[in-house]
Amino acid sequence: MKIPRILLAAGASGSGKTLITCGLLQALVNRKLKTASFKCGPDYIDPMFHSRVIGTKSRNLDTFFTDGDRTRYLLAKNAGDCEIAVMEGVMGYYDGVGGTTSRASAYDLASVTDTPVILIVNSRGMSVSLAAYVKGFLEYKNDSHIQGVIFNQMSPMLYPRMKKLLEEELSVKVLGYVPKVEDCVIESRHLGLVLPEEIPELKNRLGKLSEILEKTLDIDGILKLAGKAPELSIPVFSDLIRKDSAFGYRSAEKVRIGVADDEAFCFFYADNLSLLEQMGAELVHFSPIHDTELPGDLDGLLLCGGYPELNGKTLEENQEMCSSIRKAVEGGMPCLAECGGFMYLHQEMEDMEGNFRKVCGVIPGRSFRTPKLTRFGYITLTEKKDSGLGEIPAHEFHYFDSTDCGTDFHASKPASTRGWDCMHYEGRLMAGFPHLYYYGNPKVPVHFLKNALEYKKERRQKKDAEI
């Protein structure tokens, strides 16, 4: 399959990847090009910027969660009908799992998808040294995939000389520069980037940025480079089923799954939801903040992560919803809760002001704030009681902890001997801090939907018995 594509990477975090990616995406959309965007790694927030503010179809591609075939399948699934796919890297280009490998790095994704890479270089304080810097990235790996360079924070006066220098000395195309643009800065917060709805006039800022990039980037050259990306051998879904039969599961009946979706609960992978639908789920979105009870006739409940700690007061005030969720879960409704959703299930949850808010009361004890990131990064979950789920790749990123994290799974860090017990896995409840990506282990959604169907049948039998 021919998918025009590029990957924007950098030597380090804070080099301008997100800003330039957003500006480029907006410029492509302005040109009326059907554009797909992808974030390398597990981050939720950048794809929300891409999709909600710019309007591109945006997904994650993560080679820790998925092998090469699944990664290429997801790329084709989400970009096969687009004119260009733009991938945004993560951290430094070669930085991967454990801090000592390139596994799950932007380089790893470029290798798995055979994608041309444009290296974004923060050029502040450098001139000729830029050539040495870029040369190091080009030569660190024989197959670096780096075919273009963009200079960030460069003056218009210096750019022509630096472009000439690099193109003469290195086998790489310089595709433009970005001057310092103070009024287009994206503000930061404790989880990385703020939500798009919280940045005043963000669309205005990106509109201005895209106008600047139209003048300072060689967008035609970027499109030409993307068009040179090699054809990919893309597996079809039946190939995934042959490798893991769980992908072939289809619920015998449609099951209604409630999905928490508002300003407090907004961290979910779109590919997770589409896989649930493919397996026979009808997704019913609701708001734990604004609705007073769960939607009717649900067979299962998804409580994803987000920012419940920023909405503690309103969540506590909505005791009708807390009671509705507690009664449903205690009554046997299957519930899958991750990170912020897990925090919300506690008896008490600390908010950002240090107040402990009374919430759902399903999990005993309280979730509380910690002074730094707690158990950050990729993990592999192993179930202790072995119900057939196997190993589950997962990810944690949170500034909160719990008096009762659960002990039904063991989490182990890749490239490390460190590990800990975590997760509640009792009856039809699966809850804890780890974030799950269903394409990494499709047995997780299958198990959830089987429980939902069982719960649906139980309710139907009970209803029939009452007639």
Please annotate each region the language model reported.
Residues A110, K215, E253, F265-E277, ...:
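C-terminal and late-domain segments of enzyme folds
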Residues K39, V174-E182, E282-H290:
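Beta-strand->loop->alpha-helix junctions that form or flank phosphate-binding loops
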Residues V255-Q319, S323-A328:
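Phosphate-binding active sites in nucleotide-utilizing proteins
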Residues T115, V172, E330-P334:
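A short helix->loop->beta-strand "cap" motif at the edges of active sites that frequently abuts
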Residues S127-F247:
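Internal gly/pro-rich beta-alpha loop/helix module
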Residues K2-L19, L25-T113, V121-G148, Q153-R161:
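ATP-dependent carboxylate-amine ligase catalytic core
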Residues P308-E383:
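Cysteine-nucleophile active-site neighborhood
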Residues R5, L33-A36, K254-R256, E282, ...:
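Residues that mark the start of a beta-strand
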